[in-house]
């Protein structure tokens, strides 16, 4: 943030976010651990659970409270969960989750379901920094060992950007060259657009080469 605008940077990321879509067949303690894995970063981090079973959701909430007592960063994680954590209940995970996931556009999305429905749900999601599929794929695997970059868009930026990649460190320069024949083909379209924008000099730079008067 200090040098942003003076030089190119990767992206402005943070606070951390996780959204977990989980059915009732999960161990509540596992899901609680996933939610807290991002809550422990910062009091401003956000952890969201989408579930389709009220009893399971309540069990996860209790598991979060129990797990907090064991964390070295309990104060930070607790403040994050208290102020920014939430549980969203839906009737049908496959039918109702996608619109919520895309609206939140979280940094990390876990789909803790059997592989087939998890993959089906993931295929419908348009906005997420990274998606972790299946009950045995906690977000921390992406942080440390999976090989995917964990510098990801936050604050709903996943709606229009992706994670850090080699492309972010490349500088590209466009090169354009027109022959007289190519200009004769492309020029009229450029003239029409320049006229529509009311930019006379733009149009003249083309028409003067086409031996036309603007």
Regions found by a protein language model. Give the residues of each.
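Short acidic, glycine/serine/threonine-rich loops at helix termini
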Residues: 1, 30-33, 59-63, 145-146
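Conserved NAD(P)+-binding/catalytic subdomain of aldehyde/semialdehyde dehydrogenases
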Residues: 1-48
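Glycine-rich, charged/polar anion/phosphate-binding loops
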Residues: 3-7, 31-36, 94-96, 116-119, ...
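Generic structural signal for well-ordered, non-membrane alpha-helical segments
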Residues: 11, 24, 28, 53, ...
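Short beta-strand-to-turn element immediately C-terminal to the catalytic PLP-Schiff-base lysine
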Residues: 21-23, 49-52, 88-91, 133-134, ...
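A glycine- and small/hydrophobic-rich beta-loop-beta segment
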Residues: 37, 41, 49-128
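C-terminal core of ALDH-fold dehydrogenases
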Residues: 99, 103-214
